[in-house]
From Swiss-Prot:
Its cofactor is Zn(2+). One of its GO terms (biological process) is negative regulation of DNA-templated transcription. Keywords: ATP-binding, DNA-binding, Metal-binding, Nucleotide-binding, Repressor, Transcription, Transcription regulation, Zinc, Zinc-finger. One of its GO terms (molecular function) is ATP binding. Pfam families: ATP-cone, Zn_ribbon_NrdR. Belongs to the NrdR family. The gene is nrdR. InterPro entries: ATP-cone_dom (IPR005144), NrdR-like_N (IPR055173), RNR_NrdR-like (IPR003796). Negatively regulates transcription of bacterial ribonucleotide reductase nrd genes and operons by binding to NrdR-boxes. A zinc finger (unnamed) spans 3-34. It comes from Ehrlichia chaffeensis (strain ATCC CRL-10679 / Arkansas). Binds 1 zinc ion. This is Transcriptional repressor NrdR.
């Protein structure tokens, strides 16, 4: 690893630790020439995959878009950012492990709903109302009845 201060390649790792569910390694390094310390991270490069939208269009999977939709559903709910990030990462790693190069949005939506059902029922209803395109109050009543009877959708 090249030192960012003197450009020497003569560096040494002083400390390493695994973070983000063992998907990222943080290394503390020291340059043996100028003695400066710096931090590097190593991240597993995962394959990219496509998402097939309801209208048939495809686009590259966007982890930030997934996070944003979950943040909207969990807004002002007693859900930690750590829990949300863990959910997003778990969904991403599960999707990444699939053999398909193109994954339909309904598969991703189902995974989000299953995770939100376990995490927070109100966030689950919020997400479901958009994902399942609720049209009237009966749609809300039906999903709430399922929650009360503790059936996963």
């Amino acid at each position: 690893m090249k030192c960012p201060f003197c450009n020497s390649t003569d560096t040494q790792v002083k400390d390493s630790r695994s973070i983000e569910n063992d998907m990222l390694i943080r290394r503390r390094r020291v340059c043996l020439v100028c003695h400066s310390r710096f931090t590097t991270t190593e991240k597993l490069l995962l394959r990219s995959f496509m998402v097939v939208k309801k209208n048939g269009e495809t686009e590259l999977f966007n982890k930030q878009k997934l996070l944003s939709s979950i943040l909207i559903a969990t807004k002002k709910r007693p859900v930690s950012h750590e829990g949300i990030n863990m959910m997003v990462n778990n969904i991403f790693y599960e999707l990444e492990g699939k053999k398909e190069n193109a994954i339909p949005t309904n598969v991703i939506g189902k995974m989000v709903m299953d995770n939100l059902f376990k995490l927070d029922k109100v966030a689950y209803v919020r997400f479901a109302s958009v994902y399942m395109n609720f049209r009237n109050i009966n749609d809300f009543s039906n999903i709430i009845a399922k929650i009360i009877s503790e059936k996963t959708p």
